[in-house]
From Swiss-Prot:
Residues reported in the UniProt entry to bind Fe cation 2: 131, 180, 214
Keywords carried by this UniProt record: Chloroplast, Iron, Iron storage, Metal-binding, Oxidoreductase, Plastid, Transit peptide
Domain Ferritin-like diiron: 79-232
Gene3D superfamilies referenced in this protein's UniProt entry, alphabetically: 1.20.1260.10
Organism of derivation: Nicotiana tabacum
One Pfam family of this chain: Ferritin
Record's protein name: Ferritin-1, chloroplastic
Main location: plastid
Location of region: Extension peptide (EP): 46-78
Length: 251
């Protein structure tokens, strides 16, 4: 109804009487139109803060200054970064380096003169470099959050990838698919650690930099496995290898 005006206004009747004052006003206006109500603005101002709490930065900084470490070997930037997240990041760094080592062994195998599948060699070499970049990206994040990078042992990968039934190309690509799925599961486990620790920075980092890319890699290698199963051994493998050599990209 018209009687319920905004809080910054007061209502006057036709005789100039204030019917429902909401704030004090130094000026009033006389009505000119019959029995209709006239709305008049109020000049009063509410000086109370909206939240009732005044931000005093130097008072709050006193508490934070007590938390700044003075020991030289202690991180200064670390904040809300749990030991579980730090350890899980180091484990994932090891996973990425192991992946890079396996892919590098595959590159060396397919680059042999008696194998000579240059497209597969190129694909696995690029995949090895990409896994190494993933490890370095995790190391940079570890340092950014104030953690300490601890490199773990890397297992020696196999050097032979020939398979009497499947052939070397299909066998190696199936190994790559299993490796990418295993890596995806480890990333999901790392994301679960971040969620349990309420570490939104780590969770966002994994979602934006790793998880989407990992699903894309699994999809692409799955298609490669399906294509190699379809062409069988022989000339079809050479055609597939030429496709990777001219158009392929790393997982």
């Amino acid at each position: 109804m018209l009687l319920k005006a905004a809080p910054a206004f007061a209502l006057l009747n036709t005789q100039g009487e204030n019917l429902s004052p909401l704030f004090s006003s130094s000026k009033s206006f006389s009505p000119k139109n019959g029995n209709r109500f006239v709305v008049s603005a109020s000049k009063a101002t509410n000086h109370k803060p909206l939240t009732g709490v005044v931000f005093e930065p130097f008072e709050e900084l006193k508490k934070e200054l007590m938390l700044v470490p003075a020991v030289p070997d202690t991180s200064l930037c670390r904040q809300k970064y749990s030991d579980d997240c730090e350890a899980a990041i180091n484990e994932q760094i090891n996973v990425e380096y192991n992946n890079s080592y396996v892919y590098h062994a595959m590159f060396a195998y397919f680059d042999r003169d008696n194998v000579a599948l240059k497209g597969l060699a190129k694909f696995f070499k690029e995949s090895s470099l990409e896994e190494r970049e993933h490890a370095e990206k995790l190391m940079e994040f570890q340092n950014k959050r104030g953690g300490r990078v601890k490199l773990l042992s890397i297992c020696a990968p196999p050097t032979e990838f020939d398979h009497c039934e499947k052939g070397d190309a299909l066998y190696a690509m199936e190994l790559a698919l299993c490796l990418e799925k295993l890596t995806n599961q480890r990333l999901l486990n790392l994301h679960a650690v971040a969620s349990r620790s309420n570490d939104v920075h780590l969770a966002d980092f994994l979602e934006s930099e790793f998880l989407v890319e990992q699903v894309d890699a699994i999809k692409k290698i799955s298609e490669y496995v399906a294509q190699l199963r379809r062409v069988g051994q022989g000339h079809g493998v050479w055609q597939f290898d030429q496709m990777l050599l001219n158009e392929g990209a790393a997982a």
